[in-house]
C-alpha cells in the first residue's frame, strides 16, 4: 500500500506549480474586478484597452519594486485598498499590480526571470502568467516592457554571472514575443546607479525637478535594417553621457569643500566610463539581433536610483575601496538621502508617451475581420442557394429518370443470356447487382426538395429483384449444397449440410439464420481468394435479401437424402450429442484448470511436465466440477433435446421418454470416459523438477512439505475437481430422481420435446451407474479430506511430516562435508528417505509416483554429493600422493631407471597407508571382499556412480599390501629362502650377495639360505659372482638401489612351482645360468604374477 501511495501521489513540483498558477489567476481576477469597478481619472469608466499595460521583469533584487515606489506616479486605488495596494515591498512573490492614472504596471517576481531556484515551477508559472495576459487582452496583451537590472549585479558579478543574466532576460523577451504575439517596445532600467562610487557626491546638488529628468539614452525607432540594431549607436550615446558628466565636473569640484567628497566627485566620471565595456557586453547578450529569433524593439537605456539607504551601499563601498586606493572607512562615512533619481519622467514622458508603438495581435485581428466578412457572405449565399436548389433538383430528376431508362435494356439482355446449367453464383452477381441498384442510390441533395421520383421506380425495381433472386440465385445455392454433400466429409459436416439442404425444401423446418450461416461459411472457405471485398459484401447482401422471406420450397434429390441418412445413422446418436456438447464455448466464469494456478506460485520450483508442456498449459474447464455442473449437465440434456427435435434430419423420431433418458445416460458415460482420460493423462504427465544437487533437493522438499505446500494445494484442487458428488451425493441418479432442480427442469423439457407416454406404457430407462469419476479418485480425495467437521488432520499431513523430516536431514547434509557427508549425514538421509518411500507405498498411484520421484531424486543427488566428496578425497589424498612419490618410478614402472623409496612405497601401499586407509574409510561398506574377485554390494555402484572397474585397482593394492607388508605397518618386508639346484658345468662357483646375506654354491651339497628384503643394514646392493669368468670376461653382476633384488629378478627367469610359495629362479650371466629354488615365507608374496609392475590409478572414481 505504501508503494501504491508513492506512485499515485503527485510530485512536489506539480503541486507547487498548480498553487502558483492558482495564485496568479486569483490576482488577475482581483485586478480585473478593480478595473471594472474603479473610476480612473474621472467619471468615465475605462475598459481593459484604454490604459496601457506594462510588464516589468528582471532578476531578484534588481530594484523593480523600489523604482515603482519612488517613481512619483499617482496610484489612485491606494485610497480604496489601503497599504495593500502597494504590494511587493521587500520582494515580489508572484506578480504585483500597480494601478496609476496613466497605466497599469505588472511587477513580476525576479525568479520568473532567472528561473534558477525552482526552474520547473518558475517556468510553468511564468508561461501560465503570459497565457493569462493573452486570454484577458487578446488584441494587445501588453503595451511595453521594462527590463530592470541592478548595476551591482553588473559591477560585482563575474563574466559568467553577467552572461547568465543576459541569457535569462533574452529568453524571457523571446517568450513574451512568442506567447503574446505582439511586438512591443522595451525599456532597460539600470537601477541602483547610486552604488557607483561618487554618485551621491556628484548629483547631491540636484533639485527635485532635476532629479526627475531622464538620464540615459533613447534610440531611434528600429527599422530592422541595421545588423546590430539600436546597439550600433550605444558607444556614441554613452560617450555623450560621459561628456555631460565631464562638463559638470569643474562646477561640482568648485562647489564641494570636503576633500574626501571632492575626491569621489572627481573620480565619478571615470567610474562611470568604466561601465561602458560590461554594459556593452550585457546589452549585446540581451538585444543583439539573431535571424532565428524575434527582433527586440529596444527603445532606450536609462540609469536610475530609487533609494540610497541600507546595507547594500556599505557592502558595495567596502568592495570598491581597494580598487580606488581609498581608505574603507573614509568611503563608508558617505550616506545617502533616500531620494529617487531619474525615474519619474522616465515612466510618464518616455514610456507612457509612446503607448502607441505596440501593435495588435495579428491573429486576433484577422479572425475578427474574417468573422465579419463571413457573416455578410453567408447571408448572400443563402439567398442564392435557395434559388439554385430548385433549379438543380428539377434538372437532376430529369437526368435520374433518363439514367434508369438506359440501364433497363442492357439488364434485360443479360438476364436472358443466363443458362440454367450454370452453377456458379458469381455468374449471376453482375445481374443481381444491376437489378438491386436499378433505381439508383439514395437521392442526392439535388434530387430532393419534393421533386424526387426514385420512390416509384424503386418499388418496381424491388419486385423485379425478388423474382430474379428466386429464379436464378436460389437454384444455384441448392445446387452448391448438393455438391458439398456429394463430395463427402465428416459426419458433423454431412449432418449440418443435410439439415440446411432439407430446410430449403421443407417449410416446416425452415431456419433462415442457419441456412445463411451454412452458405456464408462455404463462401468464406471456397470462393476465390482474389474476390474483392465489395463482391463478397454484394453476395451476402443478396443472400440476406433472399432469405429475409422464405423462398418457395426447392426440389430436393431424394436419393441423395436417403443415402446421406444411411451414412449418418452409423454414428451413435449419443456420440453426436456429446460431440456437440464438447464443442460448445465455455462461459467466461468457468475457468480452465492449470497446475500453475492450483499449486500456487511455488509450483514451477517443484513441478514439471514430462511432456515438456508448461504448467500453465490448461486442462479444459469442461472437465472440471463447475464444467460438469454448470455446462455439461445443462448442455447435454439441452443438446439431447435438440437432437430429438432434429430427428427429422435422419428421418426418424425419438418418441419414447425412456429412449431420451437412455440417450442422456449414454452421453454422460462418454463424458465420464473423456473426463477420466483427461485427468489421468494430466496427472501421469506431472513429475518433479530435475534435482541436480543436495541443495536443490532440500529446497524442493522444503517447498513440498511447507505450510503453503504446492503439493497439498494441487491434491486439494484435484480432489475438488474430481469429486462430482460433492454437494449432491445423489447426482448419479439425476435422470431418475431429479435431485437437482436445474436438471429436473431440463429433463422435463426433454420429455416434452420427445413426448411422454403413460407411466405403465413406456419403457423404463436403464439404471444409472455410480459416478465413476468420484469412485476413481476416491482414494485421492480421502487423502486430503479432514474428516467429519473438518477438525481431524488429513492423511496427507502424515506424509508431509515425513517429507519435512527428510528435508531436515537433507538440509543438514547440504551443509555437511568430509567424513560427516560420507557418514552420519548420509545414513540419516537414507533412513528418512526410506520412511518417506514406505509412506508413499500406501498412497494413491499419482501421489506414490510423485513422492518416489522426489525420494529417488533426493537419494541420487545425495549420492552425487557423496561421489563428489569421494572424488575430491581421492584426488587430494591418493592421486596427488601417487603422482609425487610413485608414478613413473620402479617398481610401478618396470622399465624406469628411477626407484621409488621404500618409505614412499610403504606409505602408499602399507597397512594403514594411503590406499588402505581410503578404502577402509570410504568404500569398504559397499564392497564384498569375500570372493576371489571383489565385487560391489547390490546397487552400490549405481548409487555411488562409480565405475565398477575401480574395484580392481583397490583389490590389486590390497594384494601388494598382503605381499609386502605381511607383518603390518608401512615398512615392506619379504622373507624367503634360496637353495641352489643346478649350475652350468663351466662354472665352478657362484656367490649371491644380497645386502651382506650370501649364498655360495660350488657343485657340492646345497643348503637353503634364509634371506630378507630389505636387509637390516639397508645397503641396497646385490652382487652375483661366478668363477671362473665366462669367455666374455665379465665375472659377475652388481645392482644397486632399494629395489636391486627385484631388478635382478626381472632380469632372471622366475617360474612358479607346484605351490604358491615355491618358485624356480634361473640366474644368468652372459649365457651362464644358475638354477635355484626360491621358497617364499607366505603364499602371499611379491614373486607371483609380478604383483606391482604395471599398477595404475584412475584419475577419478
Swiss-Prot record:
Membrane topology: Single-pass membrane protein
PANTHER family: INNER MEMBRANE PROTEIN-RELATED (PTHR36153), TYPE VI SECRETION SYSTEM COMPONENT TSSM1 (PTHR36153:SF1)
Keywords: Cell inner membrane, Cell membrane, Membrane, Transmembrane, Transmembrane helix
Protein species of origin: Pseudomonas aeruginosa (strain ATCC 15692 / DSM 22644 / CIP 104116 / JCM 14847 / LMG 12228 / 1C / PRS 101 / PAO1)
Compartments (UniProt record): Cell inner membrane
Disruption phenotype: In the deletion mutant, TssB1 is still recruited to the structure containing TssK1, but the assembly of TssB1-sheath is aborted likely at the nucleation stage.
Transmembrane stretches, start-end: 371-391
Its biological purpose: Core component of the type VI (T6SS) secretion system that plays a role in the release of toxins targeting both eukaryotic and prokaryotic species. Plays an essential role in stabilization of assembled TssK1 structure at a fixed perimembrane site.
GO CC terms in record: plasma membrane
InterPro entries according to UniProt: IcmF-rel, IcmF_C, P-loop_NTPase, T6SS_TssM-like, TssM1-like, TssM1_hel, TssM1_N
Protein name: Type VI secretion system component TssM1
Amino acid at each position: 500500500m505504501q508503494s501504491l501511495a508513492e506512485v499515485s501521489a503527485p510530485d512536489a513540483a506539480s503541486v507547487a506549480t498548480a498553487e502558483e498558477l492558482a495564485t496568479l489567476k486569483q490576482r488577475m481576477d482581483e485586478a480585473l474586478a478593480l478595473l471594472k469597478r474603479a473610476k480612473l481619472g474621472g467619471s468615465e469608466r475605462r475598459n481593459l484597452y484604454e490604459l496601457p499595460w506594462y510588464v516589468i521583469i528582471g532578476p531578484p533584487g534588481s530594484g523593480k519594486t523600489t523604482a515603482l515606489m519612488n517613481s512619483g506616479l499617482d496610484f489612485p486605488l491606494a485610497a480604496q485598498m489601503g497599504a495593500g495596494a502597494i504590494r511587493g515591498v521587500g520582494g515580489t512573490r508572484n506578480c504585483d499590480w500597480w494601478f496609476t492614472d496613466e497605466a497599469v504596471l505588472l511587477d513580476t517576481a525576479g525568479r520568473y526571470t532567472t528561473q534558477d531556484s525552482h526552474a520547473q515551477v518558475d517556468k510553468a508559472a511564468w508561461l501560465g502568467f503570459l497565457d493569462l495576459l493573452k486570454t484577458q487582452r487578446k488584441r494587445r496583451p501588453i503595451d511595453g516592457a521594462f527590463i530592470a537590472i541592478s548595476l551591482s549585479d553588473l559591477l560585482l558579478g563575474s563574466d559568467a554571472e553577467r552572461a547568465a543574466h543576459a541569457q535569462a532576460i533574452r529568453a524571457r523577451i523571446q517568450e513574451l514575443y512568442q506567447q503574446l504575439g505582439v511586438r512591443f517596445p522595451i525599456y532597460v532600467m539600470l537601477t541602483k546607479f547610486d552604488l557607483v562610487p561618487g554618485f551621491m557626491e556628484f548629483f547631491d546638488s540636484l533639485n527635485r525637478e532635476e532629479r526627475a529628468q531622464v538620464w540615459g539614452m533613447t534610440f531611434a525607432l528600429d527599422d530592422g535594417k541595421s545588423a546590430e540594431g539600436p546597439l550600433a549607436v550605444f558607444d556614441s550615446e554613452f560617450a555623450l553621457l560621459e561628456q555631460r558628466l565631464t562638463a559638470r565636473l569643474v562646477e561640482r569640484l568648485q562647489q564641494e569643500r570636503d576633500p574626501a567628497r571632492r575626491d569621489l566627485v572627481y573620480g565619478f566620471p571615470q567610474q562611470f566610463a568604466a561601465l561602458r565595456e560590461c554594459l556593452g557586453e550585457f546589452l549585446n547578450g540581451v538585444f543583439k539581433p539573431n535571424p532565428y529569433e524575434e527582433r527586440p524593439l529596444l527603445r532606450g537605456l536609462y540609469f536610475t536610483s530609487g533609494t540610497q539607504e541600507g546595507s547594500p551601499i556599505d557592502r558595495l563601498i567596502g568592495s570598491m575601496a581597494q580598487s580606488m586606493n581609498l581608505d574603507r572607512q573614509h568611503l563608508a562615512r558617505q550616506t545617502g538621502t533616500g531620494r529617487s533619481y531619474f525615474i519619474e519622467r522616465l515612466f510618464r514622458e518616455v514610456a507612457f508617451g509612446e503607448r502607441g508603438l505596440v501593435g495588435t495581435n495579428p491573429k486576433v485581428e484577422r479572425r475578427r475581420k474574417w468573422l465579419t466578412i463571413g457573416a455578410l457572405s453567408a447571408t448572400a449565399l443563402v439567398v442564392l442557394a435557395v434559388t439554385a436548389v430548385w433549379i438543380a433538383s428539377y434538372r437532376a430528376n430529369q437526368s435520374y429518370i433518363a439514367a434508369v431508362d438506359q440501364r433497363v435494356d442492357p439488364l434485360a439482355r443479360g438476364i436472358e443470356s443466363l443458362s440454367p446449367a450454370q452453377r456458379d453464383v458469381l455468374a449471376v452477381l453482375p445481374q443481381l447487382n444491376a437489378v438491386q441498384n436499378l433505381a439508383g442510390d439514395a437521392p442526392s441533395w439535388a434530387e430532393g426538395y419534393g421533386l424526387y421520383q426514385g420512390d416509384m421506380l424503386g418499388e418496381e425495381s424491388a419486385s423485379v429483384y425478388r423474382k430474379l433472386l428466386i429464379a436464378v440465385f436460389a437454384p444455384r445455392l441448392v445446387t452448391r449444397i448438393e455438391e458439398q454433400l456429394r463430395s463427402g466429409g465428416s459426419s458433423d459436416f454431412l449432418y449440418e449440410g443435410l439439415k440446411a439442404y432439407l430446410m430449403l425444401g421443407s417449410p416446416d423446418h425452415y431456419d433462415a439464420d442457419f441456412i445463411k450461416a451454412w452458405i456464408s461459411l462455404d463462401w468464406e472457405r471456397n470462393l476465390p481468394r482474389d474476390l474483392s471485398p465489395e463482391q463478397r459484401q454484394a453476395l451476402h447482401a443478396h443472400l440476406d435479401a433472399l432469405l429475409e422471406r422464405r423462398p418457395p420450397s426447392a426440389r430436393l434429390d431424394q436419393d441423395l437424402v436417403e443415402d446421406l441418412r444411411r451414412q449418418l445413422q452409423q454414428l451413435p446418436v449419443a456420440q453426436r450429442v456429446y460431440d456437440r456438447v464438447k464443442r460448445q464455448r465455455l462461459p467466461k466464469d468457468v475457468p480452465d484448470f492449470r497446475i500453475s494456478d492450483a499449486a500456487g506460485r511455488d509450483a514451477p520450483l517443484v513441478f514439471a511436465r514430462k511432456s515438456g508442456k508448461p504448467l500453465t498449459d490448461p486442462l479444459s474447464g469442461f472437465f472440471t466440477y463447475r464444467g460438469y455442473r454448470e455446462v455439461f449437465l445443462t448442455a447435454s440434456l439441452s443438446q439431447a433435446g435438440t437432437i430429438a427435435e432434429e430427428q427429422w434430419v435422419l428421418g426418424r423420431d425419438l418418441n419414447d421418454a425412456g429412449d431420451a433418458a437412455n440417450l442422456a445416460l449414454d452421453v454422460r458415460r462418454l463424458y465420464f470416459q473423456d473426463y477420466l482420460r483427461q485427468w489421468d493423462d494430466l496427472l501421469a504427465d506431472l513429475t518433479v523438477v530435475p534435482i541436480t544437487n543436495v541443495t536443490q533437493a532440500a529446497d524442493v522438499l522444503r517447498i513440498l512439505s511447507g505450510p503453503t505446500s504446492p503439493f497439498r494445494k494441487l491434491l486439494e484442487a484435484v480432489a475438488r475437481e474430481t469429486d462430482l458428488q460433492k454437494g449432491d451425493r445423489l447426482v448419479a441418479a439425476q435422470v431418475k430422481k431429479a435431485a437437482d432442480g436445474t436438471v429436473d427442469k431440463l429433463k422435463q423439457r426433454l420429455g416434452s420435446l420427445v413426448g411422454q407416454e403413460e407411466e405403465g406404457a413406456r419403457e423404463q430407462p436403464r439404471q444409472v451407474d455410480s459416478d465413476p469419476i468420484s469412485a476413481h479418485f476416491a482414494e485421492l480425495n480421502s487423502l486430503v479430506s479432514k474428516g467429519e467437521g473438518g477438525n481431524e488432520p488429513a492423511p496427507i499431513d502424515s506424509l508431509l511430516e515425513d517429507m519435512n523430516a527428510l528435508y531436515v536431514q537433507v538440509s543438514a547434509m547440504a551443509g555437511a562435508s568430509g567424513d560427516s557427508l560420507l557418514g552420519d549425514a548420509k545414513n540419516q538421509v537414507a533412513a528418512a528417505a526410506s520412511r518417506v518411500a514406505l509412506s508413499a507405498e500406501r498412497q494413491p498411484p499419482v501421489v506414490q509416483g510423485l513422492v518416489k520421484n522426489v525420494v529417488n531424486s533426493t537419494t541420487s543427488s545425495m549420492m552425487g554429493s557423496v561421489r563428489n566428496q569421494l572424488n575430491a578425497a581421492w584426488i587430494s589424498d591418493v592421486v596427488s600422493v601417487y603422482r609425487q612419490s610413485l608414478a613413473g618410478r620402479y617398481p610401478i614402472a618396470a622399465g624406469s631407471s628411477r626407484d621409488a623409496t621404500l618409505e614412499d612405497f610403504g606409505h602408499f601401499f602399507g597397512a594403514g597407508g594411503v590406499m588402505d586407509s581410503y578404502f577402509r574409510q570410504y568404500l569398504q561398506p559397499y564392497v564384498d571382499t569375500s570372493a576371489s574377485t571383489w565385487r560391489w554390494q547390490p546397487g552400490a555402484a549405481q548409487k555411488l556412480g562409480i565405475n565398477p572397474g575401480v574395484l580392481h585397482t583397490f583389490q590389486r593394492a590390497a594384494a601388494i599390501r598382503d605381499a609386502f607388508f605381511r607383518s603390518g605397518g608401512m615398512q615392506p618386508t619379504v622373507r624367503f629362502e634360496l637353495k641352489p639346484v643346478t649350475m652350468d658345468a663351466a662354472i665352478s662357483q657362484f656367490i649371491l650377495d644380497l645386502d651382506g646375506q650370501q649364498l655360495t654354491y660350488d657343485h657340492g651339497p646345497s643348503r637353503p639360505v634364509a634371506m630378507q628384503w630389505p636387509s637390516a643394514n639397508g645397503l641396497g646392493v646385490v652382487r652375483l659372482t661366478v668363477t671362473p669368468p665366462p669367455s666374455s670376461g665379465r665375472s659377475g653382476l652388481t645392482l644397486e638401489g632399494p629395489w636391486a633384488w627385484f631388478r635382478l629378478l626381472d632380469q632372471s627367469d622366475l617360474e612358479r612351482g607346484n605351490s604358491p610359495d615355491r618358485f624356480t629362479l634361473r640366474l644368468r650371466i652372459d649365457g651362464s645360468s644358475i638354477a635355484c629354488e626360491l621358497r617364499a615365507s607366505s603364499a602371499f608374496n611379491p614373486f607371483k604374477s609380478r604383483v606391482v609392475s604395471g599398477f595404475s590409478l584412475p584419475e577419478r572414481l
